């Protein structure tokens, strides 16, 4: 690649199932590399498997990238000079490339059935599971005609080179597959429909992709891609062979690869819990890369400025939910209060949770919990006591704080609060401290815990005095009186 050529990377998922974090990590690294180099991020949909692909999954991919803020320069709904960007709409392009490969002798029709290939291996004393034996390379015109007369439908196979296939992986260094270790492989089904093995490198060539950043699990297919790129160059379809970088595997529990069945692999499960994009992307960036030692907390702009695929680690990366949670909590704390309030309201609305506070009071309540939550979903448990239909005193909290000692506290609190003229947190605090800490000589925990349980129903809540202010005089006093009735007479 010359100095004047622009980096072009691609993210090309298949629209099956729900987006998972390993897939998103791949998208993030491609996006960050494009942004770091001033290059182009191409989003392409590999939807050639009609039985597995779904429109629902396609829309989920769009939703995922948009939620995360990983904008694409070319692709669905954006367009670009090398469209269409859905492989299901590129059938004519693949047919033309196949015809040119066949005409140039780079590919050939193969009629052998899997059973015939296995039988030939057994007859020759070879392992029957070796795979295709390149038998059809040497068929005569008469043999091909005979097979066609039988009604056989051939696949198209690429003629693999007789040399070693090697590349300098940007993550793993030099990789070599010995000559003859990869057999001629199918480019089409017997129906003539193109396979991933054709369309993926073909589109990379036609879309002028310069760097392929993808998961380590795809490394064994790279020799086939190299061979096809070489053939595409010879027939004038491709200009170059892209540089490859195979990203480290993401592990789940133990040493197993994180699979779609693992709960933490589901991107939308993290969103539903209340992860914010900044927190999740920060953590995913650390799955195989680091910005610097002892510097795990950073934003996307900082990542883009520092990211180079050459710095990606080749060792497997383990998904650590606790660390992901901790980083998300930090990013929540870093949000502007107004921004946090909007995001919290949206999250609660999405999950059917309404807090019975007006806009100003909700903003104040949001600020109270911003430093006390790990994910947005945690806020509901802290704030739902503002709703009378959600307010209930937890029996364990009552047993702990609303015993005989609680009666005197509540009596003194009710008397003190009755005289508060302006129902604000500072005046509420002053009145309660004077009555309970000075008047009853109680330590703060003993003084305020019964009031917290009475007002919020639990031992864990936002700051007490601010909560009482937002709850309002009438509801606060009503709840304290009701709790006093529970205690009975001192």
From Swiss-Prot:
Gene3D superfamilies in alphabetical order: 1.10.10.350, Glutamate-tRNA synthetase, class I, anticodon-binding domain 1, Glutamyl-trna Synthetase, Domain 2, Glutamyl-tRNA Synthetase, Domain 3, HUPs
Keywords recorded for this protein, A-Z: Aminoacyl-tRNA synthetase, ATP-binding, Cytoplasm, Ligase, Nucleotide-binding, Protein biosynthesis
Role summary: Catalyzes the attachment of glutamate to tRNA(Glu) in a two-step reaction: glutamate is first activated by ATP to form Glu-AMP and then transferred to the acceptor end of tRNA(Glu).
A GO cellular component entry from the record: cytosol
Record-linked InterPro entries: aa-tRNA-synth_I_cd-bd, aa-tRNA-synth_I_codon-bd_sub2, aa_tRNA-synth_I_cd-bd_sf, Glu-tRNA-ligase_bac/mito, Glu-tRNA-synth_I_codon-bd_sub1, Glu/Gln-tRNA-synth, Glu/Gln-tRNA-synth_Ib_cat-dom, Glu_tRNA_lig_a-bdl
Subunit comment: Monomer.
Main location: cytoplasm
Family indicated by similarity: Belongs to the class-I aminoacyl-tRNA synthetase family. Glutamate--tRNA ligase type 1 subfamily.
Species whose genome carries this gene: Mycobacterium tuberculosis (strain ATCC 25618 / H37Rv)
Xref: NCBIfam families: gltX_bact (TIGR00464)
Compartment(s) of residence: Cytoplasm
Gene behind this protein: gltX
Listed EC numbers: 6.1.1.17
The keyword Protein biosynthesis is assigned to this record: yes
Miscellaneous information on this protein: Was identified as a high-confidence drug target.
One of the Pfam families matching this protein, by short name: Anticodon_2
Locus of motif 'KMSKS' region: 257-261
GO molecular function, one term: tRNA binding
Catalyzed chemical reaction(s): tRNA(Glu) + L-glutamate + ATP = L-glutamyl-tRNA(Glu) + AMP + diphosphate
Keyword field contains Isomerase: no
One BP annotation, GO: glutamyl-tRNA aminoacylation
HAMAP family linked to this entry: Glu_tRNA_synth_type1 (MF_00022)
PANTHER family listed in its UniProt record: GLUTAMATE--TRNA LIGASE, GLUTAMATE--TRNA LIGASE, MITOCHONDRIAL-RELATED
Annotated protein name in UniProt: Glutamate--tRNA ligase
Signal peptide annotation: none
Positions annotated to bind ATP: 260
Motif 'HIGH' region boundaries: 13-23
